[in-house]
Structures are given as C-alpha cells and as structure tokens.
Amino acid sequence: RQDEPLILSSASGYQLNPKLHIMTDYQRFDELVSSAVRASSVINKVDILKNALDLYHGKVLSSADGEHWLIQFSTKYHLSYMGAVSELLKQLDSLHSYDLLNQYAMKSLTIAPDNPKAYCWLIRSLKAQGMNELATNELAAAKEHLTTEEYEEILAFGANW
C-alpha cells in the first residue's frame, strides 16, 4: 500500500487514510480506557489503566495548543486522562499498592498539575505509609497549583485520612 497517501483531504478537513489502518496513541488510549470500564477484576482494570496512562504524555499537539481546531480534541483527551488517573489511583488505594499509587500520582501531576484527585490519592497514600512530612509537602504543592475550591475539596477528602 505504498501508493496510498497517509493523509486525505476532504471538504470537512483532513484525516488519516482509513485504508492504511493506522491507530494513533490517542485511539489506543481510548480503546484501553473503554476496556478498563468493562474489566472483570480490579487487577485487570489496574493493568489496563496502567497501559493506557503509559501512552499519554501530555496534551495533544502541545505545540499547537490554543488553536481553535484542536481545543475540543485536546480537552477531551486531557479530561479522559485525568479521569483514568483518578480511577487507577482509587483502585491502587483499594489494593494498598502505595508504591505504584505514588508513582502514577507523581507522574500524573507532572503532566496535569491541576488534578485535585491525584493530590487527594497521593496525600492519602503518603499518610497511610506514615510519610506525614511528604504528605504535608504535597498538600502545600496542591495549594499552589489548585483553585481555592479545589484545595478545599482536598481538605474535605482529608477528613477520611
């Protein structure tokens, strides 16, 4: 299929040539997140979500961030990523898998420092491990990165620590 063009142009815009059966990381991410919802066990769900999150490295085409044609697509995947992270962290907490929880929470906060749920699960995990000073440091970081309302949400969640 070397004679097939990679990108097709139409009246509605550009698209990857469907005859080439190309799957992007973002399509694979969507597929994995959907599979995680249907997973039969917590362990399967965790494995699938880890695979999905390992594909996500930040906003789609960040060099074109703010372009009107990209905003809806980029926002959809960013919100889907934050939802998948929150679900993975919740499942890891239920398994008391704190090392993995810490790892994925920290990675997610480098990609999306505006995710209050990642802070919640990370702080909860650190406290569960007796790492109170680190938990306090993360709470301070959350206060810097989040809105007042989001920060108060973390404090309310903290009543369960």
Where are these regions (language model features)?
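DNA-recognition element of transcription regulators
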Residues: 1
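Intrinsically disordered, charged and Pro/Gly-enriched terminal/linker segments
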Residues: 6-161
